[in-house]
Amino acid sequence: LQGAVTCFYNDQWEGYGDAPAFTQAIEEHFSTIYQKKTDQIDIHIGSASIESASNRLLIALQSLAEKYQTKVNIHVSEGISAVESCKRSRQTTPIRLLAQLGVLNENWNLIHAVNIDQEEIEWIAKADAKVIHCPVSNAKTGVGIAPILALEAANVTIGLGSDACSNNNTNNIL
């Protein structure tokens, strides 16, 4: 049995700009946490969502994932409101933003990915990024159903997740 723990870092909320000094301190903190990695527990890096991460932070997370040979976990396109928020502040969707920044690749675990279109599915597949499906949380919050069949048809790897306690009464994925 194996699992992963994610250290989430956030440096903004949509539209308020980033905090470069905070971004610079992330590696020092993550390197300390990463030392706790074992054969059974991997340590991932991430941000709670596109809304809580500046472009600078998204690029920094990718750099750290490469350096530490780990994954980046991030909530994307969970609900239509998250997609619309990203469009308002960044003039694009979350998946397109990651692609435009040049960070969308095999290191990225895209949590939820409910409100994505066929072109985004193709980009996810081409990048070999993964989607983490959280059906219980998605049902509780009413954000919709991820396009699992379309993702599967595109050969995207789909994992099963529980989301967080704030969006789910349990972290039991079964």
Protein language model annotation of sequence segments:
Residues 1-114:
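Metal-coordinating catalytic core of metallo-dependent amide/deamination hydrolases
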Residues 103-174:
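Active-site-adjacent C-terminal substructures of enzyme catalytic domains
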